[in-house]
């Protein structure tokens, strides 16, 4: 710190300027609320410098206070018991009591209406006492004037709560009391309005005074400050001084950014030049104003309120943003001019610091979420101390990254920050700072000590400072700073990650170099983030980060462009740093990823990451592994946590240094790049995004695997593609970098037995090397979308998308490999040689290859070799899944993702490709970790890893042994397998495919080897060997299960293959050797794919993964059509025996279909279902059909839930008919073979377009106290209009249309969740291209985890609106006058079929004359509401529509019933007539689901009189002999006839003669405005099943012998029914039948009857109103 500090002596400079450039992003880490911005974050006494953390300016008393505050957990007041309303007669005594808890002890104030009661002088009327936490108000001899609303208000430093009770005395009822109260409120409101109007006039004057006050304090500073909202929020104003303009602009920019995204917590948001100095420009020339500034700050703070002011207004933020943009430009120029600024440049950075400080305040909130100390201290201090030159450069970088971080929420970090959604304003600047400083101090000390101990080098910040004087090591410090910044942004960004949407889509482009690195780490982190995100989303508030991100993306794009401009070197360095950091922390990774997206931030992040990691570790108890890594990691050289690993740093330093040389130049260049560059880069990115989007459609399905997988793969791909596309120059540079990193790596590699550090380093190097060239690509990729990324990843697997695409047979140039590997040329070379000579099987090398395979083409090639390698065995499969499908990681998405982060370090090799040797030894471990989580403890459901990430060498050895065992088993075939794998590689990228989609291989061995093992080894043998490994119980179990399932799957495949050997196209088990055609190769790959997908399914891969992998493989094959035929070895006797050749040549089976379709189609869907293994084709393979259409995981997990045949894809024959039904096959005449072919073709075409599940169903609780839950999930790749359907226990509960491209979350609200709502919920999306679904079991255990409904003591205010049919039935109803009143809800009652919630409520007042006070009534609300993100499908809108429909249905039926009653009374002897009670619409403003219906309480248990078959009413059925039941059936008959079969009441329940819970069916959609009640089948069913009774005869109703009877009956009954005047329909049914469009297409009645019905329908429509639309909600409206 000292050396850094030397750069700028001023406190501002010392703390901020030196590091400012680099750490500006970091610096902002602290970012308290606007109020606290007035503090200079970095200011602290000289002594505090040693802490290496930003300490509070006034660290003395405030620090002590903050420590004490932290020691005691403060809680806001809480009423354990609330006031109970009382009603007494006059002269009675009354006591109100309540029990309040909270710390500090709350102070309770009593109010009568709005008048405070004196706690001491109340006698003789009242007395206020309290004993402990029980507070009492005693009233004596109450009179009517004492009747009022009494309120107890409890407050402490944490908040204020209140409760109230009503005292009724004598005739002064509650109603009157409330009326009196409302009158008072109205008077108050009127007076308030007058005051406001007057205050507007004085407002300007007041603000002027405030300004004057501040100006008096410090005219200079004041002018530089901007005030956010009044004096309280002293914020820097636009700098006045010209010389400060550049720097101030920079800081403003940074500030603006941070302010703009305060919620994002862009700790790194500072503009490149800004050094976060609490908003004060750092004194120029290093003025030594520490003392003065501190004093000034204190004064300002004293003047201003202690509470943190509200966040800056949007307008101000916008203003700041705008200002910051120019600032950025200036900063860029400054950077270009003086990227190597000397300490003199510190001044600008100092100004920047101001902005940083502001950003800091903004960021601080997120940062606070993380351990403040860490975040603040690392970035702030380091950034402050970074050299000016570093500052200049880094400022630029930071500028870019800062914005990016926000857009790229760090999912991993997000968990920690979760509590602090970016939006939440910091409690108070001062307090925040204090806390921050406190934490910083503690964390700094701990960390500093730790880092020092571990690192010998100074603590992260210290080291940064010490590493080089500002001028000396600008790059290194910058890098380090960048990492710090990144981590900070990560934390700040964390909140955004909450949103689990495609991060990449929203992620801003990364800087070129960084983007590459970022993409790698971001892949990992992103997948992590996703896994975390899944949990996080609920944990962390879902911040609408995506939009913000988007904003950033646009805006950040330039910044990021800057970042990319940053300089390949810098970017590379930062990425490198970031990469380790990422590896180090899953959260860091996540963050890094996000940052990576931002690119620069990712780079900045590493340093902070350490800090963050510590913070995370502290804050994030969640990731135990992270903690361990953090604690151990530093020692471990985990490499994952840059901050953690001094080693990492040491390596990073060399790496950085090595990279710095070129990078520095690059950086300078980057800084020199004009903004225009950025725009062009932006355009580039945009173009790329477009391209990617196009590709996304294709890649979408692959994407489908797992968003995380896709991401990882995508990023890997990107990395690969980037590497592939990297220009030679970049390559050279990257090589240099990699060399540098190699030099630094060696120690690290050696240092870390687990190889994790090595891997992470390798990743870094790899990222670096790839990054420089790939940065743009990366950013673009990032921008594109996860899907695009995924696709690119696949491409990468196939070959670098860039066009360096290397066929599996040919490795990329060594340099390229090096790039990819980034770790060492040697390793790359080894890899190259390995890949080149896959036949040579060196278990380790193959492993290495396998690991790297996923990442680079060369690697993927190697991977193919891997499959054959026994050593690769388990690891291989894991690897295959990891690289290929990223499945292993994603497969166990929940586990793998975290494990992935963990793996990243440990499985980094996998990603790294480059680090062959180190990886080789550790690959199995890494692999195991990734797929099995062997190395890492099982991640929590959140996806966070709960265990240590570090891999156990023992585990690795055990895995190796196991793999060797497998090798021995398959040794005879090893060479063959190798050859095969090589061939496979040759075959159209099958190698990569195999990685992506292994055939039925055991642990990734070649199919042949796997087959042999399966044949020779018994299930328990494998399982036992797995069990004998020295693994943790968890891992062991998981591994064993994996092997077990794998073996089972393999055996199944084997059996299927054997069965299909002859007639079927290739069985899955046969090695993926393409003997004849691409098609066959495609088939094989497909088989492989399906098998892999099965395997994945077994592993718990995400639904749709199978499809994805399959899709990927076909794509790959298509991509490299010629490769399939390359160098196939001669068929071995075994192969021939297995029928491999035969298989390959069997494409004729598909040949029946059009030749063209066969290719793609066969590849994608060999025969039947893309998913189902070939075994599905074999006649004797039962059960495959069910699996074929859904993801393997789902098939296995939810097979029990699945409606048999509902989604099954029957077999070949069925397929055709199925496709016919769905309209896919429009040529019924085609012979069966052709039909199959056509079906296959279409399916093959659609595979890429079929929707995919991106997020499975998860449950959340609504924020209000209503007890309602939300189930939500998300689909992507929705390329055409789709229908989204929710079902509970296989009963559809609602559906909603989704337009193409609408990939927002799909949600189902469960209103007032209760045990009756438990069941299996499924969400299915379907369109012409396919369908995807996801299930969730809502069990009582899950339900018990949520807070049950809370009912306020005094109920809730409501608005009630009656429905009026002023014009009779011709009118669809209108609404009467509203009544305002209050209800108290009581117990919940059951709903019919769980589709409706009914609760009894007591009317307090306001609903007369309909409901008298004290009367009970029933509130009903649809219990299941399907909604979505769009305004048309919003929860409120759906709730309103469904409720309105319910009102209309019942009230319209009531009108019909009135007519029926009139006719019935005319019939002598008919007797009493059923009556349908009215429904009233109520609006409850305090409820998230505000609309409901209100009806009278019938006071008796309900009986069912009519019910449609599908949903039996909740009430017991009335006796069939019941008069009421018979009359209800007569009413149905009469109504059916009276409306000519257009309208029918299908459900009635009631007590005695009063009916409710009405459901209807209409023949026409939209009949009478009833949108969702079109069920023509129910009308037909009624007509055929109704049996007339005596009451039907009394009314002269004709028997219904079928639908056709309706018309004649109507005719006969002309006098009584509207059909009387309609002659046309009866006259000539035939012509009508032809001429009229049949509204009831679904009806299956005879033509004549249909014609008549149509005619009568038309007439009815004319008579009764406009046609409606149908909505599943009517169903949801069942009886209570």
Curated annotation (Swiss-Prot):
SMART domains: Alpha_kinase, IG, IGc2. Residues 320-337, 785-796, 1087-1111, 1151-1165, 1231-1244 have a biased composition (Basic and acidic residues). Residues 1-37, 237-288, 302-759, 785-950, 1078-1128, 1147-1244, 1603-1680 are annotated as: Disordered. Its main location: nucleus. It is an enzyme of class 2 (transferase). Residues 514-532 have a biased composition (Low complexity). InterPro entries: a-kinase_dom, Ig-like_dom, Ig-like_dom_sf, Ig-like_fold, Ig_I-set, Ig_sub, Ig_sub2, Kinase-like_dom_sf. Its EC number is 2.7.11.1. Residues 402-426 have a biased composition (Pro residues). Residues 339-353, 557-566, 731-744, 917-932, 1639-1660, 1671-1680 have a biased composition (Polar residues). Residues 9-21 have a biased composition (Gly residues). Involved in cardiomyocyte differentiation. PANTHER family: ALPHA-PROTEIN KINASE 2-RELATED, ALPHA-PROTEIN KINASE 3. This is Alpha-protein kinase 3. The gene is Alpk3.
